[in-house]
Design a protein with these regions (language model features):
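Core catalytic alpha/beta fold that binds nucleotide/phospho-ligands
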Residues: 1-188
Length: 188
């Protein structure tokens, strides 16, 4: 309770306390509140987040495009005043290998980072989630997104081509590998 008072303005804190009642899970409450605190920290003013019928977040005053992601212990928010954006954060975990067939295309190659292909797999997964969030009415088949070949470094950029639309847009995706997660972001 002390932290909420220090991190959000009083009017917003009261509103948040009421909105938090909709969540049963303590983890989900923390994620939801963390996003609002991070947004307030970024903008130094209170903003309301709404959600489209597809579940995509938006600021109710339309001042910025927004994308949100969370993973165990972390949240990520990206804003852009002019163009839609996407962001994704994925915690390190070997389980990603079990689902490679759901998102890695035969013409894609997953490279290792510091001898571990888990990082490369997570970057593929995260980048495709990021681009998917940025696209309008996107097909949820992540195999319709193709990463250009790249050798993972601690941070950098790579290209992602989407094959879900006639336009087959090309996205530049930024990334960073941290101690226990990867973070990817793009703008449309």
């Amino acid at each position: 309770d002390v932290y909420k008072r220090q991190l959000l303005p009083d009017a917003r804190r009261v509103c948040c306390e009421q909105e938090l009642l909709q969540f049963a899970s303590e983890r989900r409450k923390i994620e939801w509140l963390s996003v609002r605190v991070l947004l307030y920290f970024m903008l130094k003013e209170d903003k309301q987040i709404g959600y489209s019928s597809e579940g995509k977040p938006f600021l109710t005053d339309d001042s910025f495009f927004i994308s949100i992601s969370h993973t165990k212990g972390y949240v990520a928010v990206i804003l852009n005043p002019k163009t839609p954006v996407g962001i994704d954060i994925e915690q390190y975990g070997k389980r990603v290998h079990k689902v490679f067939d759901r998102f890695i295309r035969p013409d894609e190659q997953v490279e290792a980072y510091q001898g571990d292909t888990t990082w490369g797999g997570l970057l593929h997964w995260s980048a495709k989630e990021t681009v998917f969030k940025c696209m309008k009415n996107a097909d949820a088949d992540l195999r319709k997104l193709c990463l250009s070949h790249f050798i993972p470094q601690k941070e950098g950029t790579f290209q992602v081509r989407e094959y879900a639309t006639e336009g087959q847009s090309l996205f530049s995706v930024g990334y960073r590998i941290c101690e226990d997660f990867v973070l990817t972001w793009t703008s449309c």
